[in-house]
Amino acid sequence: MAAYTCTSRPPISIRSEMRIASSPTGSFSTRQMFSVLPESSGLRTRVSLSSLSKNSRVSRLRRGVICEAQDTATGIPVVNDSTWDSLVLKADEPVFVDFWAPWCGPCKMIDPIVNELAQKYAGQFKFYKLNTDESPATPGQYGVRSIPTIMIFVNGEKKDTIIGAVSKDTLATSINKFL
């Protein structure tokens, strides 16, 4: 088995010298071998946070995004596994619970609708958001399999469930059933 040494640098970032084991005799051109590959500096699979903060475009975009602190952005209080009983099941008013996750696109789509309804029905309904990533026990207990899922509770009992990104009219109709 003959070993050939490639001494010319290929157009992609590979070591300048590499040994290729081959059984046929003869030579080949590294330019011909790599000419079918696109010009590239390789893939970066990891990005450091420090490099992101140095990029002004990325840091500008990052400042306007609020995922984990969605309750701060929306004004709707958060409920979790530990506060579920006291805030939802023992509530005096009907309760509207939005089961969501920060990565969920449809959850982001209905968020402005839920905020608008929370303002409209303030004093008649209590509105809460439950992050299913941070509090997985409660969604499991109530059979939440997809998000967004909206549940309405009256006197601690689940009365209605709406699954998916639905219209404002659909949500308002469900709320009006329990006023």
UniProtKB/Swiss-Prot annotation:
Extent of the signal sequence: none
Thioredoxin domain boundaries: 67-179
Domain of life: Eukaryota
Active site positions, chain numbering: C104, C107
Swiss-Prot/TrEMBL site (Deprotonates C-terminal active site Cys) positions: D98
Site features described as Contributes to redox potential value, chain residue numbers: G105, P106
Listed Gene3D superfamilies: Glutaredoxin (3.40.30.10)
Keyword Transport tagged: yes
A Gene Ontology BP annotation from the UniProt entry: response to cold
Function: Thiol-disulfide oxidoreductase involved in the redox regulation of enzymes of both reductive pentose phosphate pathway (Calvin-Benson cycle) and oxidative pentose phosphate pathway. Under reducing conditions, activates the glyceraldehyde-3-phosphate dehydrogenase and the phosphoribulokinase, and inhibits. the glucose-6-phosphate dehydrogenase. Activates NADP-malate dehydrogenase.
Family indicated by similarity: Belongs to the thioredoxin family. Plant M-type subfamily.
Name of this protein: Thioredoxin M1, chloroplastic
Lineage start: Eukaryota, Viridiplantae, Streptophyta, Embryophyta, Tracheophyta
